[in-house]
Amino acid sequence: MTQAYYRKTPQQALEAQNASAEGLSAQEARRRAEQYGPNKLSEGKKKSTLQVFLEQFKDLMVLILIIAAVISAFSGNVESTIVIFAVLVLNAILGTVQYEKAEKSLESLKAMASPTAKVMRGGVRVEIPSADVVPGDIVLLEAGDMVVADGRVLENFSLKVNESSLTGESEGVDKTAEAIDADQVALGDLKNMVFSGSLVTYGRATVLVTGTGMDTELGKIAALMNQTQQRKTPLQQSLDSFSAKLAMVIMAICAVVFALSIFRTGMGILDSLMFAVALAVAAIPEALSSIVTIVLAMGTQKMARQNAIMKDLKAVESPGSVSVICSDKTGTLTQNKMTPQKVYADGSLLEGEDLSLVNDVQRLLLKAALLASDATNNEKEGTAIGDPTEVALVMLGEKFGVDEESYRAQHPRLGELAFDSDRKLMSTLHDIDGVPTLFTKGAIDVLLNRSTHLLTREGKVEMTPERREELARVNMELSMEGLRVLAFAYKELDAVRPLTLEDENGFTFIGLISMIDPPRPEAVQAVADAKRGGIRTIMITGDHKVTASAIARQLGIFRDGDEAVSGVELDGMTDTELDERLPHISVYARVSPEHKIRIVNAWQRRGNIVSMTGDGVNDAPALKKADIGVAMGITGTEVSKDAASMILADDNFATIVKAVVNGRSVYANIKNAIQFLLSGNTAGIFCVLYASLLALPVPFQPVHLLFINLLTDSLPAIAIGMEPARKGLLDQKPRDPREPILNRPLLARIGGQGLLIAIVTMIAFYLGYQGGDAVMASTMAFATLTLARLFHGFNCRGSESIFRLKLSTNKYSVLAFLAGVVLLLLVLFTPGLKSLFMVAPAFGFANLGEIVLLAFLPTLVIQLVKLVCDARRGK
């Protein structure tokens, strides 16, 4: 609807809606309410809590465990079944709770709607619920009102609207009633339209409603939110791939063992099946799902302490693999407040702080800036109130101890010509030393054409073409730096009288004041750190291309050879053309929510893990579409927070870099935990296969494997997950998301380490089997495998030797080892537990000494190999 109305005149717009300035009749309003429905945002289809809970069991590893648990139950091994199901249900509950907290986007969008609206109905002004507004209604807007529907401005009285929640830009937008004759106009340039969810900050207007509910720009965003599908996180993708491959390997091994048990050892089918199930339980890292959840939860807590709040546990490691950050400008990379910068007066271009109140021209420039504005300073709260541009002028006065209130008290306003987007001027009349003086601020091109003189320290001089050219040159120079420039002039009147537009001529030009929404100081370093870590930062903004490029250059985002593209230019590109130019585009200006999703999609097509940061409603769909959406916690709308995976509590772009380091650390710790669990399980598989091939007694009882996998292993694995971040993580490039979590080097380490542990375990088995005592052999193998895996926890802390890492850097690894040893000793020497865990009655401390020596051998070998590797790397 918007595109059809901005080109029409007010009268044509009324005719198109079959409406009049008197408003709709009550009967017609009811008819249209039935036709168009309530002025509300529709809700997306939601999953029930039960659906969410059941979806937690779709993971392949979980399904395999369920099958193993069911077979165990039918085979009489009830204890294993109960423990496995308890672990799976706990994981499902945790996943459901996280999901329920994250899905609230549409509720926040609905809450943004104003509860009431002032409309004309049958020539009478009435106030109605915003849900009852229909297309064709005449809405009356004034300062402080929330716009409740999209509409065409019919009458404009200096209306200024803050559309930052839609466009992302904090500067108020001046509205007009004039038609716009253009084929394609960006949302931020539709000066004769107002949009649902925006706020009126100044003036008033009469508006014809052209769109309600889902037919508004806000509704389009809600629709995008419903349609946008979130991709799985890199960790989810890696674990899915890992689970599928591990399942195939386990099923193949179990099939081989099942066959060997029948044909090699002569075991019955049921016994062989139970043995194969026991092997499956030994092979599957039952604790992995719980440990990954715990490691992610601990990562979440650490990030929260660093002001990065993660909503989805599975996304905690995602920042570590991000290769592209698509960042909103206003409030994210910049401070979201206009700040005075350079001043031009008396032929000199100065920094704002270099302004001299001794200089008559500069003093008059400051006086004009404070008098010809309406912003005020709130001393109690330490903030200024008003239009952001005028707030910057108040800030300039503060730098020199000049209070705008005292200025205005000394020189009260005697008359005013309010700002108008057509004139691009604002004028106020004051008494200056007994002389009625008109101060005017506005666009330099307008004021230059209306100025006949220029003020210098010598007095007024004629405004010659050369002087106009010089002022225009300075303005262009400031604009190219991304600065917004305001011009100031004055005119002395003969007497105090009502002002007319004719008075805005014959000015004496005073000077220029420029301002900017400055970059956050920490954002500059954060962008540089991101680049060092192999991460590309892209600026996406609703601002003008020149301004955005200048800010991006200051931040280090935009470099020589880079491109800046507007939303209109982006519309003219095919996906193929965009893909070709994508690596060179660093700035996207005047973009819509659809553009943002298209940009994210383009980078994802190239195999990148994409992060999108933002704080406005307009960012929400792209935040949800991105691999990881980052919302601002202070300035961000509830919509953006609910759509994002991560919220920055301090709105600090630099916090993202900390999240990257933490994400990489979390992924490394999960990978190390997987190495620990699988190498230990591999050792158990090697032992069982060896025993099957040689027709030896079963080396482990099912209760042994359950003890190792669910109790002893979990403690060191959790400790590995608490390993502090290594130095130099930010110097590494983002990992390839296509790389499996189990790559060849890791598989080789798992296989080699598992073989070492299996060898010492089977040596212990033979030591116990010397007298043909199968129970003693099983006890020796069980105790050795358990202790060897406890020692192995130190090997899996990282790639460096523990002699370089130092045990003190992770006290939890020591505590986990000691706790595991205590549990093992209790099982081996406590009478009641000995019988429960089928420990040989003859097992004593002499046997324990043999076990300790054997169990430590794999760790000794692995640490010696690491020392050699460290020496070769020059560490």
Task: Name the predicted role of every residue range.
Residues 607, 664, 759-771, 788-798:
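Alpha-helix capping/termination and helix-coil
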Residues 712, 757, 779-793:
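Generic alpha-helical transmembrane segments
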